[in-house]
Amino acid sequence: MKLLTIFIYLLTINFGFTAEKPDIKNLILTKNLKVYEDVIFKDVNQKDVDLTDYRGKLLILNFWATWCAPCKEEMPSLDNLQAVLGLNNLKIFPINISQENVTKAEFFFKELNIKNLDIYFDNSITLAKKFSLRGVPTTIIFDKEGKEFARIIGSIDFNDEKFINWLKFYN
């Protein structure tokens, strides 16, 4: 009986407090949490945005470009994700990596009726290099301590219930 109690306790520790990877295409969990120094990009007014200012929040960095068809496809669902109830500790940064002017990026958002997200820029592709991006869209998810724990390579439907429930575990 004592052995059974210990076994059940160990199962609870190993399985009861972890979030399993949902069956979501393109989602890759990071085996070792990654910490990056100097994660800085620009807002629409060309002011620096530093991720360290957002410690304590679940962060999503979505790298996109106006010429990217899959980016255009997923952006409305990313916009909706920012407004999901129960994810009030989530901050999403859609970061344009093409070397375009603000007007073109704003037109892209207006054309897609994006209302919950602001536009950010990595025109010098400093972050794209730092994160070793291979293409767009790529989404990087950081925990509340600023450590990368997941990536999405390619597009997904951010409105997917399995994805939202998985994200709520970290919120």
Go through the PLM ranges and name each one.
Residues 50-72:
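Short active-site neighborhood of thiol/selenol oxidoreductases, capturing the structured segment around
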Residues 73-112, 123-129:
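Structural microenvironment flanking redox-active thiols in thiol-disulfide oxidoreductases
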Residues 54-57, 87, 114-116, 133:
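Active-site acidic short loop of glycosyltransferases
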Residues 14-18:
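Sec/Tat signal peptide C-region and signal peptidase I cleavage site
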Residues 107-115, 122-166:
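Thiol/disulfide oxidoreductase modules built on the thioredoxin-like
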Residues 19-51:
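N-terminal "domain-start" segment that seeds a small globular fold
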Residues 4-13:
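Sec-dependent N-terminal signal peptides
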